[in-house]
Amino acid sequence: MSWGTELWDQFDSLDKHTQWGIDFLERYAKFVKERIEIEQNYAKQLRNLVKKYCPKRSSKDEEPRFTSCIAFFNILNELNDYAGQREVVAEEMAHRVYGELMRYAHDLKTERKMHLQEGRKAQQYLDMCWKQMDNSKKKFERECREAEKAQQSYERLDNDTNATKADVEKAKQQLNLRTHMADENKNEYAAQLQNFNGEQHKHFYVVIPQIYKQLQEMDERRTIKLSECYRGFADSERKVIPIISKCLEGMILAAKSVDERRDSQMVVDSFKSGFEPPGDFPFEDYSQHIYRTISDGTISAAKQESGKMDSKSTVGKAKGKLWLFGKKPKPQSPPLTPTSLFTSSTPNGSQFLTLSIEPVHYCMNEIKTGKPRIPSFRSLKRGVSLIMGPALEDFSHLPPEQRRKKLQQRIDELNRGLQKEADQKEALNKMKDVYEKNPQMGDPGSLQPKLAETMNNIDRLRMEIHKNEAWLSEVEGKTGIRGDRRHSSDINHLVTQGRESPEGSYTDDANQEVRGPPQQHGHHSEFDDEFEDDDPLPAIGHCKAIYPFDGHNEGTLAMKEGEVLYIIEEDKGDGWTRARRQNGEEGYVPTTYIDVTLEKSSKGS
């Protein structure tokens, strides 16, 4: 089967067919392009979906901890990888299918144009040969008619008796001329006819079959290319199936990793306050006064008894006690609320805390019907934190258990930072030793600012660790003695009809009012008085600052390079020395930043 022999006379049909083939190729390329756009949009939408539901972590505290959340975020990661595979499919189709189709379509157009031009040229050449043959034929026919006319004229004059011999001779010459020209045109026509027949045979049996064969091969290559692109279209999808299967397996593994018991334990770890549940309220017997009155038989005895009890209650007013959930309400405010339980001043301006029986009934109802008020203990700190407000730096606004965890996490982070700075200091010292031994490698003095900065960071981190460890010890100490305090409070209930709260606040008897000592400054706790020194510590030596120290942290003393200070307390092994300026300002400075000179008496001691 060959187009050259079977379709030798269908040039126009082959022209239309090859054009349709290229149009079909371009249409399929357009289909692939739209499929690529769909894959790209699908991948983009998947990535936007993952980005929308992924956690926006601004700190480590917001990292997911529950297994269900971690599993969901793992699924999002796998879905993000799946979106990446859809992008791979789009890229593969764009490179192997769409790009190849567009290049091949361009080549086909060029090749088709060339073959059709060759066919048209061959046809034009054959038409030219036919015109030459036709012209020679017409000329031969015309000369033959002229020769025939000349012969008739000669015969007519030759038979005419009146014609002269000259006329006959002239007609004979004309006949011979026309006959000669007819013979020449006959030979020309025969030659042109033979040439045309040869060219026509060559055209239909050699040239046209060759051109049509090339067109046929071109069209078959187009069909093969379409088949390859169909296969590449499917292969682009099939190549990513193993990776997509792994993504789906990862989602299944994430689903299997969900542990409900572990999540429940995390809830406990996250919200456990460390407080103990409130103890039982003691029975307060108010009827004993009535029974005493009846037994005495006089009303005056009851009055005297009540007077004695009132005098006893005034003695207890010297003890500072706090109500369980806040301040005692003012007498002129009938509706009780949690925020109106405190009375904070006396006529002379001193501040104190009072308590009456009405808040007891209110709090009993709150405990039974309202939501738990235990979180209100978070801000209690030795009975004064309700006035001072929460201290965020030491996490005192958190319950003991949560505060302990936060402090431990901070200490661990500070220890890691301290280890990093220590490693950097060691590396700088080694580099400094190398520079000192080999000056051509560098200037040892250039490392001094970096060493000073590193030492400053080390001292700062040590002080932070020391401060947080002190807070942690405070929390652990309170947690350790809470059971003993609870036991002692139960004994006090039996003796004084009172009750101690989990953080050291107290409730009072049924009809007694207990007032604490007046506070001159509401924003200062009793800790300030415990650490105030009446007399300044004596100087045991002096020191000179080798490096400057900024002293931004609380309790530190800023100093300039070369400044002379008094030593009032030696280094206890924590890297800090207590110093004082001449103006009396005191604070701690890094021991490694100063040159210490102690007096002989202090050295001997």
From Swiss-Prot:
The cellular component terms of Gene Ontology attached to this UniProt record, alphabetical and capped at eight, are: cell cortex; cytoplasm; cytoplasmic vesicle; cytoskeleton; plasma membrane
In this chain the SH3 domain maps to 538-599
Q: Any idea where the F-BAR domain is? A: 1-263
Top-level taxon of the source organism: Eukaryota
Secretion signal, residue range per the UniProt entry: none
Q: Where is this region: Interaction with DNM2 and WASL?
A: 541-597
Where are the stretches annotated Interaction with DNM1? 522-605
Please list the GO biological process terms of this entry.
autophagy; cilium assembly; endocytosis; signal transduction
Instruction: Name the segments for region: Disordered.
Output: 482-538
Q: Where is this region: Interaction with DAAM1, DIAPH1 and DIAPH2?
A: 541-605
Q: Site positions for Mediates end-to-end attachment of dimers, renumbered to this chain? A: 165
Q: What positions does the domain REM-1 occupy?
A: 397-474
UniProt keyword Disulfide bond, yes or no: no
Region entry Interaction with CDC42, spans: 245-535
Family recorded in the similarity comment: Belongs to the FNBP1 family.
Subunit structure and binding partners: Homodimerizes, the dimers can polymerize end-to-end to form filamentous structures. Interacts with GTP-bound CDC42. Interacts with DAAM1, DIAPH1, DIAPH2, DNM1, DNM2 and WASL/N-WASP. Interacts with ATG3. Interacts (via SH3 domain) with ABI1, WASF2, CDC42 and WIPF1.
Role noted for this protein: Required to coordinate membrane tubulation with reorganization of the actin cytoskeleton during endocytosis. May bind to lipids such as phosphatidylinositol 4,5-bisphosphate and phosphatidylserine and promote membrane invagination and the formation of tubules. Also promotes CDC42-induced actin polymerization by activating the WASL-WASPIP complex, the predominant form of WASL/N-WASP in cells. Actin polymerization may promote the fission of membrane tubules to form endocytic vesicles. Essential for autophagy of intracellular bacterial pathogens.
Its domain comment says:
The F-BAR domain binds the phospholipid membrane with its concave surface. The end-to-end polymerization of dimers of these domains provides a curved surface that fits best membranes with around 600 A diameter, and may drive tubulation.
Protein's UniProt name: Formin-binding protein 1-like
